[in-house]
Amino acid sequence: MAEKLSDGSSIISVHPRPSKGFSSKLLDLLERLVVKLMHDASLPLHYLSGNFAPIRDETPPVKDLPVHGFLPECLNGEFVRVGPNPKFDAVAGYHWFDGDGMIHGVRIKDGKATYVSRYVKTSRLKQEEFFGAAKFMKIGDLKGFFGLLMVNVQQLRTKLKILDNTYGNGTANTALVYHHGKLLALQEADKPYVIKVLEDGDLQTLGIIDYDKRLTHSFTAHPKVDPVTGEMFTFGYSHTPPYLTYRVISKDGIMHDPVPITISEPIMMHDFAITETYAIFMDLPMHFRPKEMVKEKKMIYSFDPTKKARFGVLPRYAKDELMIRWFELPNCFIFHNANAWEEEDEVVLITCRLENPDLDMVSGKVKEKLENFGNELYEMRFNMKTGSASQKKLSASAVDFPRINECYTGKKQRYVYGTILDSIAKVTGIIKFDLHAEAETGKRMLEVGGNIKGIYDLGEGRYGSEAIYVPRETAEEDDGYLIFFVHDENTGKSCVTVIDAKTMSAEPVAVVELPHRVPYGFHALFVTEEQLQEQTLI
């Protein structure tokens, strides 16, 4: 059943029809046999331990939370963050990307705060609730011959209609975006889920959106909303041709025709970027190679360190790929971009560049303390006149989750805020970069000076998450606040912290105590009071 809106787009209520019976029980037995014979249960699952461990129960709105300091008026709205939170125990392996999406929200109004946590009610979650157990294949299982067998079990469950893929099988656990009166929960293997924020801050899953049946492919977790035009730019990647499809969605929520883009083989493309004129795609050598998974006991996505990194720059309103320009830079992978803009003949991309990534690092079968990895801030330049490309390193150590004042999306901006990492997942601090300043050379660690204008250190045993910039009503780019979740492993307690984005002072503006711990997660978003009031949903 689809709920039609006046703009022609549709929200589809999710009502999967899984089935129990003899074939279901038989496949359960087969799966248990495969796991018993081929899976090493002694391997630790790091991302199901400590504060990575899920909180199984939802939390309805808890009002009047203790607030230390003050919550500025511009923070009236709802701060939301999504992340993996598996409701049921894994059958075998577990990758951090596998968990069911759970949104943690803090509703702020007139200096008071309310906390809520809700699962995104995906088709996948509803079906596993029907069975009372995990039934869908996990990324953490996709390694070696064991991975091939688990793929076959999944295919049999679908073919025999034990599982229903009518509404997709994604987790909606990666990121959030607000566009055309709708808060969307995203995961790049599925369509967006529409979430309504209620007056008391509660979160309600309404269903998936397919833009009046025009969306027939996956949808990136990192679409870009142009703050001037109100349009949203997005893409999807696939294991079958076309491997990449670009889309534009009007400010009124109308999805334009697809633009297939040719790349040589299926890859993982987690993010992209826009300028006022262009869209920038990243053909990076993180390849989908199931044969190598079986033969070489690798993850199903494996990185090829011998291939160049390719960047495609396409006029953002192009009707086809004929005008795309491809540029090459040294081998790398990129999870997240900060922003992009144009300077004369050049397109500039600010990004977090990673060398020799290994997705197996987040499969959980690793030591407690992961090796530091070189995910560093870079400036890349693509000359549209000469066809040349160059890059320059802007940070001395690992940073990720880059954020900006989103009023500058697609335009030249000065400041980038990011997270300081001591491993692939644990955030030890928040950092502020000034792109107008030169990076200090010879540094091996991040410290104030040069292009680093401030560092907010979380302290021993305290770890944070992606920090979202919320502007005050002012013309200055960095005159606002950063808001983020923090967990204290010393006490087991979590909070939301607000700091001054201009000064990066060690003294927080506000700390909101939360009723229980909040597991580490992925991306966050601040939904303004105005956006809450303009939600176009029932």
Swiss-Prot record:
Its main location: cytoplasm. Induction: By drought stress. High expression in flowers and siliques. Also detected in stems, leaves and roots. This is Carotenoid 9,10(9',10')-cleavage dioxygenase 1. Binds 1 Fe(2+) ion per subunit. Keywords: Cytoplasm, Dioxygenase, Iron, Metal-binding, Oxidoreductase, Stress response. It comes from Arabidopsis thaliana. It comes from the Eukaryota. Fe cation binds at H222, H270, H336, H523. Belongs to the carotenoid oxygenase family. Its EC number is 1.14.99.n4. Disruption phenotype: Plants do not show any phenotype alteration, but leads to higher seed carotenoid content.
